[in-house]
Curated annotation (Swiss-Prot):
Gene3D superfamilies: Mannitol-specific EII, Chain A (3.40.930.10). GO terms for biological process: phosphoenolpyruvate-dependent sugar phosphotransferase system. GO terms for molecular function: kinase activity; protein-phosphocysteine-sugar phosphotransferase activity. The modification Phosphohistidine is found at residue 63. InterPro entries: PTrfase/Anion_transptr, PTS_EIIA_type-2_dom, Sugar_PTS. Pfam families: PTS_EIIA_2 (PF00359). This is Mannitol-specific phosphotransferase enzyme IIA component. The gene is mtlF. It comes from Staphylococcus carnosus (strain TM300). Residues 3-142 form the PTS EIIA type-2 domain. The PTS EIIA type-2 domain is phosphorylated by phospho-HPr on a histidyl residue. Then, it transfers the phosphoryl group to the PTS EIIB type-2 domain. Keywords: Cytoplasm, Kinase, Phosphoprotein, Phosphotransferase system, Sugar transport, Transferase, Transport.
Length: 144
């Protein structure tokens, strides 16, 4: 999974007015990486309008609806570190991982990210690091 995380797709020390702005940033990063078309950003917002992608432990994983499969060009991940947090419905997200999975890979990606974030120590390291390499190391050490 760490092969999908490039330093260019890890954004440290971000701040956002609201979850919609964070979704736009995550979606645009996926567009810029060549993983999705622009349509995918709206699909991420559409999913969020139906069901929150907040997973607990300060983590939100916005991703597109099933109808947006055609907007996914290749699997991709982007991570936004938000030390001060952003309001996400009734919760506060400190890490937002935007995902796009090709050929059903999104379920595997969701599972691996959720497992990594189930450990409070991993969450703390990701929220507080100043290095993209450290974030990748957390996922590698979680061995997911």
């Amino acid at each position: 999974m760490t092969e999908l995380f490039s330093n260019e797709n890890i954004f440290l020390n971000q701040s956002f007015e609201d979850q919609n702005e964070a979704i736009e940033k995550a979606g645009q990063a996926l567009v810029d990486a060549g993983a999705v078309t622009e349509d995918y950003i709206q699909a991420m917002k559409d999913r969020e309008a139906v069901v929150s992608t907040f997973m607990g432990n300060g983590l939100a994983i916005p991703h597109g609806t099933d109808e947006a499969k055609s907007a996914v060009l290749q699997s991709g991940l982007t991570l936004l570190q938000i030390p001060e947090g952003v309001q996400w419905g009734d919760d506060v997200a400190k890490v937002v991982v935007g995902i796009a999975g090709k050929d059903g890979e999104h379920l595997d990606l969701l599972s691996k990210i959720a497992i990594t974030f189930s450990e409070e120590e991993n969450v703390d390291r990701i929220v507080n690091t100043k290095s993209p390499e450290e974030i990748k190391a957390v996922f590698e050490e979680a061995d997911v």
